[in-house]
Amino acid sequence: MGGHPQLRLVKALLLLGLNPVSASLQDQHCESLSLASNISGLQCNASVDLIGTCWPRSPAGQLVVRPCPAFFYGVRYNTTNNGYRECLANGSWAARVNYSECQEILNEEKKSKVHYHVAVIINYLGHCISLVALLVAFVLFLRLRSIRCLRNIIHWNLISAFILRNATWFVVQLTMSPEVHQSNVGWCRLVTAAYNYFHVTNFFWMFGEGCYLHTAIVLTYSTDRLRKWMFICIGWGVPFPIIVAWAIGKLYYDNEKCWFGKRPGVYTDYIYQGPMILVLLINFIFLFNIVRILMTKLRASTTSETIQYRKAVKATLVLLPLLGITYMLFFVNPGEDEVSRVVFIYFNSFLESFQGFFVSVFYCFLNSEVRSAIRKRWHRWQDKHSIRARVARAMSIPTSPTRVSFHSIKQSTAV
């Protein structure tokens, strides 16, 4: 209601004409509520104000609290807030009732809609930026064959999984109308299954990243023993039977609304959410061990203590998004507080939509091998296309015996 929450109520009171019959019934109801109260001494009698709020019999000198009206003059109000009225020392009610806390639910719904639309914009913007960054990173890994080691192949597959997930996200957003949801046609269920499959592959490729780092840093095994097919089985293979089992469960127990959401008491979604949470927990253990080893190695070095901690913090900040620990935030319940829910909605929307962008930055754009390979290619391209290179090549060509040079013509003319 803005800065004057009583303004609408006051305007309504000026135009209000209560039906005598309904007012009488309200008085009787209010009086019946007060019968149970046993008050001695000076008191205010039960009363119904012009808004319809019942103020029960109360002792003199007391501030009485009553819920805000649920519905008044065509406007719904939040009944979790309260109105206040004082029972004066002389046993009469104060003329003024404090309804300053009573807020229109209409305004709250408008605020919720605004926050929802902003969150939708953040989601679309984040997924667009992420998809562009992921495609650029994918092309770089495709073109730069000189850096194709197992570590970068894992990065490449993770980026591919994120591309497919982002692409199916756009398919879901653009095709899943309310009518399609209700019809529950076969293709929309396949789209949902594909989206969930690529979502799970993101987690398992992050698990592959964690396995590789843990093997290389903590277990100190030679990474030459690791094979590409092992990680392909983990990243692309393991999620497939998980999603098949989930789809069968949905088909038999929750076959509605294109398999989005879930009915109360049906827990088929945990078939794929459970393994995702499990690999997150394992990655958390990997992260703890990796940071512990990094701290030990840094402490054993000759650098100062400040530099040691700085490197440890940098390593931690890099490893957090790499191992997917940020997804832990998506399982947090923000509670009923409005501020917490708004912050959670924005924070969740930002993290989920920009996750692909962060992966591209950490795995590709900040990758020293990728940057070095790009720099070499750029220098080769400059050498090939620069004027200096063309002149140098022309000067290096030997003069043919049958070709007369400009210098020899000049000398013969002088003679």
Curated annotation (Swiss-Prot):
**PTM comment text:** C-terminal Ser or Thr residues may be phosphorylated.
Keywords per UniProt: Cell membrane, Disulfide bond, Endosome, G-protein coupled receptor, Glycoprotein, Membrane, Phosphoprotein, Receptor, Signal, Transducer, Transmembrane, Transmembrane helix
Q: Where is this region: Important for antagonist binding?
A: 280-290
Matching SUPFAM superfamilies, A to Z?
A: Family A G protein-coupled receptor-like, Hormone receptor domain
Q: Which stretches are transmembrane? A: 112-142, 150-174, 190-218, 226-253, 270-295, 307-331, 339-368
Q: Which GO terms describe its cellular component?
A: endosome; glutamatergic synapse; membrane; neuron projection; plasma membrane; postsynaptic density membrane
> What InterPro entries does this protein's entry cite?
GPCR_2, GPCR_2-like_7TM, GPCR_2_CRF1_rcpt, GPCR_2_CRF_rcpt, GPCR_2_extracell_dom_sf, GPCR_2_extracellular_dom, GPCR_2_secretin-like, GPCR_2_secretin-like_CS
Q: Which cysteines does the record link by disulfide bonds?
A: C30-C54, C44-C87, C68-C102, C188-C258
Q: Which residues lie on this side of the membrane: Cytoplasmic?
A: 143-149, 219-225, 296-306, 369-415
Task: Give glycosylation sites per the record.
Answer: N38, N45, N78, N90, N98
Tissue expression:
Predominantly expressed in the cerebellum, pituitary, cerebral cortex and olfactory lobe.
Q: Which residues lie on this side of the membrane: Extracellular?
A: 24-111, 175-189, 254-269, 332-338
Q: Where is this region: Important for peptide agonist binding?
A: 99-108
Q: Name one GO biological process term.
A: fear response
Signal peptide range in chain numbering = 1-23
Where is it located? Cell membrane; Endosome
Superkingdom:
Eukaryota
**Reported function:** G-protein coupled receptor for CRH (corticotropin-releasing factor) and UCN (urocortin). Has high affinity for CRH and UCN. Ligand binding causes a conformation change that triggers signaling via guanine nucleotide-binding proteins (G proteins) and down-stream effectors, such as adenylate cyclase. Promotes the activation of adenylate cyclase, leading to increased intracellular cAMP levels. Inhibits the activity of the calcium channel CACNA1H. Required for normal embryonic development of the adrenal gland and for normal hormonal responses to stress.
| Record remark: domains | The transmembrane domain is composed of seven transmembrane helices that are arranged in V-shape. Transmembrane helix 7 assumes a sharply kinked structure. The antagonist CP-376395 binds at an allosteric site, far from the presumed binding site for the physiological peptide ligand.
Tell me the protein family, please: Belongs to the G-protein coupled receptor 2 family.
Q: Supply the name of the protein.
A: Corticotropin-releasing factor receptor 1
- Please tell me the species this chain comes from: Homo sapiens
